[in-house]
Structures are given as structure tokens and as C-alpha cells.
Amino acid sequence: MAKNEKQFVEEITKMEDDFPQWYTDVITKTDLVDYAPVKGFMVVKPYGYALWEKMQEFMDKKFKETGHKNCYFPLLIPESLLNKEAEHVEGFAPEVAWVTHGGNKKLEERLCVRPTSETIICTMYAKWLKSYRELPYLYNQWCSVVRWEKSTRPFLRTSEFLWQEGHTLHETAEEAQEETIQQLEVYKALCEELLAMPVVAGQKSESEKFAGGERTYTIEAMMHDGKALQSGTSHFLGQHFTKAFDITFADREGNLANPYHTSWGASTRLIGGLIMTHSDNRGLVLPPRVAPIQVVIVPIAAKKGNVMETVDKIYADLKAKGVAVEVDDRDNYTTGWKFNEWEMKGVPVRVEIGPKDIENNQAMVFRRDTLEKDSMPLEGLADAICDLFDVIHNDMFEKARKHREDNTSIVENMDEFRKALEEKPGFIKTMWCGDAECEAKIKEETGATIRCLPFEQENLGHKCVYCGKEADSMVVMAKAY
């Protein structure tokens, strides 16, 4: 490796030396994001936005398959609307950004820049809904929201972020509950089928649930450093908002009733999760299904023989199969530089083709996830690479799943709890009595929170990890982003 090529890679801090700096190096040096002039805001650059577009495409297809429609609601919400649901405003008030002037004129009422849209959407639903025949309302919007965060990190926690938020109304509580779980399953599929990111699905504790909701469900992923990342949430809101906003409909008996309400969302923090699940000290490692560029072809000695003719054929064959492929035929960079750059950008597959390869009717195929290189026959190469995508996805998923399992501890008491956090940072499975005071004490003493009560419960005993009282709920706890 030439000196400048080696330096190119060494510009990324090693994650074992300084994990936060490693993350910052990866997201900036791979051109995903840049810092905006306003603290806590980010510019998502084309390569980073392409990742979000892939996620959008996956979710949008799933939403529409179940009858959901996209729409758009205003950015600004009158303060009086925000105040209508007491728990909700209390939960979001510290993070709200306020508009107080229109031009040079002070507004009669402050307007908040949406931190989430329940209040404005419910206001409109109250205006529109008349009869049970119109239900369910199945609406989703793609937008940005603003939450004035004190401590920020691009993608993971920013004052403005991109997301989708679904808001639905239903005739019965059972239908609303079914909707809530259905959308959580969409997020689970997004993480596991597109991002190769294993997640634990479950219900949030009362103290961790959405402000103004009855029940919140979540998917939690483990990052390289053992911390949890909440990767998508779905809320059963009951009738809290529909009563507060006087949303009524004529039911089947002709009586006025309040519908049942859900909301659910996933955001660009998933990009941060993707990076911290798979990437390494050389840069990004992207699963093929979400990678903006799935294959890069690097010609070797491009001007010799029929190298470029062969490259063009491989390119055309891959394009015909819907593969996102690029040819790097820049003549002002060395081959080594090109290899390092594409590895840093996380392109899943690199195809190298030169005169000797053509003589042998083969190409060299490099996998970014394993850093392994093998020869493949030119005949049927495009099909072989498409098959390889599935192998890479499954291998990456399994590697992340094993990392989670290897860094999950089972504990029975607080001594074991503290020891596990110190010796093997990661998830902790334990029993909890359901008392919010025990939950708060654990957080205060260790910094770990209940990430969820998993749907897949395990019997780990009958005593609460903190107080020793009778317990019948297994929880997953961790420090979290």
C-alpha cells in the first residue's frame, strides 16, 4: 500500500480507541453528512440521502400494500393545539422550537415547529370524520421534525431529522391494536430484511412510553459498543387524543363515539444504526439491499487488450438485472487508491478485471464485509453476483446477531447487573417487578434503562433484580443512544 493510500485509510480513528470519534470520522469521510451552521442540524449529502431513499422505498411499499395513503400536514402548530393533551405537551415542551414573529410583527399566538404531528392531525381529523363508514383512516406523512436537543450527533440525535409518521383512526380498540403491531412488524422487516440489523421487539415500560399514549411498542438494536438504539416505535394511543380533540363519529347504532388512534414512526437515526451495527475501521460496510452502489467495477490496465469492452459487458449485464453498478475508470488515481476509497464507502462488491483475468475467462470479486477476494467465471458473472448479495446479507445479519448474543448477559441481582455492565457492555436480560421506582433506581445507579419487555418472554426466575419482590416480567436493559 502506497504511503498516501495508507494515510487515506488511517484517517479513520479506530473504534476501539475512540468509538464516538470513529463514528464521526466514518459519517463525514464517506460523504454521508456535514454539519450545518445551526448547532444540532445536519446536511444529509447525496450518498447519505440515497440510504434514506432506500428505506423510504421499502416502507412506502409496505404501507401502501395495507391501504395506507401519503399526505402532508403543516409544519407550524398553534400553541393552543399543543396544550390540548396534557401528557403530550409535558413530554415535548422542553424540546419545542417556537416561532414568535411573522416578518417584523409579533404573533398573537406562538407557533411551534412540529416535534411530532398528533395535535395538528387530530385537529383535521375532527373536522373530517363523520361516520363509521369512513373508518379506518390510514394516513402517513414523510417530513422533518424539530426537537431542540441539548446533545446531538448526526443521524443518531439531531435537532431536525427526517422521518415518516403514520396516524390512523379505527372503529374499535382491537383494530387499532392490530394496526399498532402490524406497523412494528414493518419496522422489524425493514431492519432485518433491508439493513441486515437484528432487533428485539417488545413493549416499552410505562415510564418509557410515548407521552399521551396508552402503550408503546419498540424495536431495539445493539450497536458495536453494546449500547441499544431504539430503531422504530409504534404507539397505541387509545382515545386520549380523540377525546381531547373531540374527534367523534356516528357509530353503527347512530350514537356518537370516539375512534381509537395509533401513531408510528421511523427516522434517519436508522442510518446511524446501520453504520454502528456493521461498519469497521476501514469505513462503511453496507448490506447490498440498501447500498446506493452495490457493485463497483475497477478496470486494471484499462488501455490494454479488450479490458474496457469486457468491463462494458459486465456493466450492461448487471444493469439489466437492476443492480446499482458503477465503473471507476478514473486515470488520475492509482488502483490502490480506488480500492481504498470504495472500501471506505462500503460498496458491497468490487469487481476487478484486467488482461490476465480475461485470458483466464474470470474476474476477481472482492467482498467488503469479509475483505475476501475470489475469482469468478466471466460466464454467468452477473447471476453469480446477484446470488452473492443474498449470501452477504445473511452473513452480515448473522454476524450482528452473534455479536448481540455474545454481549447479552442474564443476571438475577444488582451485583451481577453492575458486574455485567462493567465487564461486558451490552444487553442485560433480567426480571422486573413492574414498579417504576425500581426502574428509576436502576437508571439512576447504573445509567441503564428498560429497553423493552420482549414479546418473546423467558422465565429467568421469580424475583425482581432490584427489590427482590415477586416478578413475572423479563426485561431487556441497556445503556442507550
Swiss-Prot record:
Protein name as it appears in the record = Proline--tRNA ligase 2
**Does this entry carry the keyword Nucleotidyltransferase?**
no
The family database entries (SUPFAM superfamilies) matched by this protein are listed as:
C-terminal domain of ProRS, Class II aaRS ABD-related, Class II aaRS and biotin synthetases
In which organism is this protein found? Clostridioides difficile (strain 630)
InterPro entries, from UniProt? aa-tRNA-synt_IIb, aa-tRNA-synth_II, aa-tRNA-synth_II/BPL/LPL, Anticodon-bd, Anticodon-bd_dom_sf, Pro-tRNA-ligase_IIa, Pro-tRNA-ligase_IIa_arc-type, Pro-tRNA_ligase_II_C
Q: How does it assemble?
A: Homodimer.
Reactions catalysed, semicolon-separated, are: tRNA(Pro) + L-proline + ATP = L-prolyl-tRNA(Pro) + AMP + diphosphate
Please give the family membership noted in the entry.
Belongs to the class-II aminoacyl-tRNA synthetase family. ProS type 3 subfamily.
Q: Which residues form a coiled coil?
A: none
Any one biological process term the GO annotation gives: prolyl-tRNA aminoacylation
The cysteines covalently paired via disulfide bonds are none
